[in-house]
Amino acid sequence: MFDYLIKNGQLIDGTGSPARRADVGITDGKIAAIGDLSAAQAGTVIDAAGKTVTPGFIDIHRHADAALFRPHFGELELKQGLTTIVNGNCGLSITPCSGPYRGEIKAYLTPVTGELSADADCSSMQAYLDAARRQPSPIHTAMLAGSGTIRACAAGFSAPTLDAAQLRTVQSLIERELAAGALGVSLGLGYAPDCFYSTETLIEALRPLQDSGIPITVHMRQEGSGVVGALREMIAVARALRTPVEISHLKSIGKANWRSCTPEMLRLMAEARQEGVRIACDVYPYTAGSTQLVHVLPPETQQGGMEALTEHLADPAFRETLKARMLTGSDFENISLLAGFENIVVSSVRLDGLRQYEGQSIAQIAEQQGKDPFTCLFDLLQAAHCDVTMIDFIAAEDDICDILRDAHSCVISDSTYPTTGMLHPRVYGTYTTLLEHFVREKQVLSLEAAVHKVTGRPAAVMGLRTKGVLAQGMDADINIFDPAQIHTRATYQDPAQFSDGLDTVFVSGQPAILHGALTGRKDGTVLTR
């Protein structure tokens, strides 16, 4: 006697194997049996005839560190089939946020994570995870230890180099956060203060992970004209530490780099794997990204934190030097040069007096104001104390297709959760966009391959041994849907719209969505290493 019996569905098990007709029995939150269960009995029987049954989807790259404490958290995730997410990415985890630099850390993270609830203690990974366990959730959540936050906790944003004591503090904090349950360590080498690491010091800072098998995820030092060199750096890190490295949201920014850098990077990773280096990548299925607007500036400008940068922007000489560097610089991720100000859209500004600019490009705002785009950009950042996010149109869909086809890639969203303004549509629509656009419309992947990239593959990357595959004894996180009915409603103009098509979603063996409707159940857990 099962608790639930899913009958007559086409089962895609998450391994990449072909779909097959099979029934699934669920008992006590686990998959109790798979096969011909036509003679079995259950408390509830769900007829999945004409539908596909898959593992629940797993997003190993979100920034919902603070959002999980908000009302209605998990609903938009469930509506696109997500049952597990991993936060703390890009080196920007919300923990450890303590000590003399706590205010600077919070100010830096807020455009990405949004405001943190007073109920959440983010002083350490242990305190944060304890708070998360007290917060009922409809989906499973896990954390990475953010290297940038750890370095900022140890030395702030002003130190371009670390002394021996500070380096030991960083290593100690990494060990502490991992011991508390972080699944791995994330790097944000395109952000302060991680961007101040040399390759050699970075390897030393990460020495606690050597030979551990614990994953390192990385937003590379740049994704523009120097992206291939940035990848070579991470191959060197993976080789030195002998632990897995996952390149986050692989892309090549700027038309000058499209269709050349991405194939080369895929080749370099394949060659490294042949040599025994454990390195792979993930990708989001959109040509636009989203992050802090300060990311268009050279990374050294973030030294000292956001208030220091705000003060510097009041200096005309600083602005002139900055403009000259941005007009020609190729030694950093020069988004304004590579993509153009017309492709940099202000998506959220926390200061009410500036929110009229949300949804407009820097080029459009500059034209309205009668300013050149650099002056417009600097004025906006200064007035908003740098608390601005952007949506930047930077990548090529053909490059995305190449990465999707790579056998070692998985799909992520890189969703940020600012508490004001416009979200990127990927927050609501990444997983249905993959199935609707790249599987059904473009046929870049088979349905089985796509499901593997959002279930079995990400589970393996993060060491989630009981998730990602439909097999006896695995956790009963399960999606049921008709692939022909999957549809993404979220757009750049109207991003906060639930996706269609997820008929039933099980979390921990209980229905979080039943017949297309959210049930309100909160059976998610906090996952730890």
Features from the language model and the residues they span:
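Acidic, glycine-enriched loop/beta-strand segments at the rims
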Residues: 11-23, 388-394, 400, 442, ...
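Active-site neighborhoods of metal-dependent hydrolases
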Residues: 128, 132, 137-164, 170-191, ...
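Histidine-rich, glycine-flanked metal-binding segment
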Residues: 1-56
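Short acidic, glycine/serine/threonine-rich loops at helix termini
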Residues: 95-102, 152-158, 199, 228-232, ...
